[in-house]
């Protein structure tokens, strides 16, 4: 690599590194993901996202005003062709505590699920159960997963289109049994930034041989849709994520999130909101039911039809 290219490489890496660290730090602070004395079980798959997550968390660990542990964990599901030597060699160089769990969930899924049927549900349950159980065994207080902002948005649309739910991936989650807290430190990070960062840092990426399941095909379709939107309307993805952080249950239709049934008017409420902001003089209201007129203030009456006629 020439000196000029090396300088550009370093400059770009430093700039990207600062941005990602800032975004991870903001997500951690906003959702109180990491607290003093935490033992973080950092789940590694060998992909770009989990490598970046571990790298950034280890850097923050050195700079943070609080003390927390990091333990890297990989689940070897015995998928054919998985290079078992890559992660141990990498983690040894980092001098980070780690565990490689071996559980042949691949064979279980192949045995239980008929050919051609989606394996995602069973596979994710087995993986989640193994990781949750191991977290409790080592006394981990938080489980860190490498999902990023794009994953969160894609999951929202997947659930909307194919599940009929407004549901995504929360940056922080309490497991159903209440025993584990899951955090997603990359929640504010863009996938394209993580991909570039992984290339610049030369992480030993383990290729992901996708199973070709229906869920993965659907996710790919949603990703293509969002990428097309982003090309056509730059900034739309950022706006979608901002909208997810600014929900208004009272302006929706979900009766579980807002008590529409009990809504009643307050006859003594002061004039405010839309009525107060309108600041229009009084005018005649047409009483359709009685074909009559209700005079409010004859002195300030205006002809509403003529005034607003186009």
UniProtKB/Swiss-Prot annotation:
Could you tell me what this protein is called? Answer: tRNA-cytidine(32) 2-sulfurtransferase
UniProt catalytic activity: cytidine(32) in tRNA + S-sulfanyl-L-cysteinyl-[cysteine desulfurase] + AH2 + ATP = 2-thiocytidine(32) in tRNA + L-cysteinyl-[cysteine desulfurase] + A + AMP + diphosphate + H(+)
Gene Ontology terms, cellular component aspect? cytoplasm
Keywords of the record: 4Fe-4S, ATP-binding, Cytoplasm, Iron, Iron-sulfur, Magnesium, Metal-binding, Nucleotide-binding, RNA-binding, Transferase, tRNA processing, tRNA-binding
Q: What is its EC number?
A: 2.8.1.-
* UniProt enzyme class: transferase
Q: Give its localization.
A: Cytoplasm
Q: Which residues does [4Fe-4S] cluster bind?
A: 120, 123, 211
What does the UniProt record say this protein does? Catalyzes the ATP-dependent 2-thiolation of cytidine in position 32 of tRNA, to form 2-thiocytidine (s(2)C32). The sulfur atoms are provided by the cysteine/cysteine desulfurase (IscS) system.
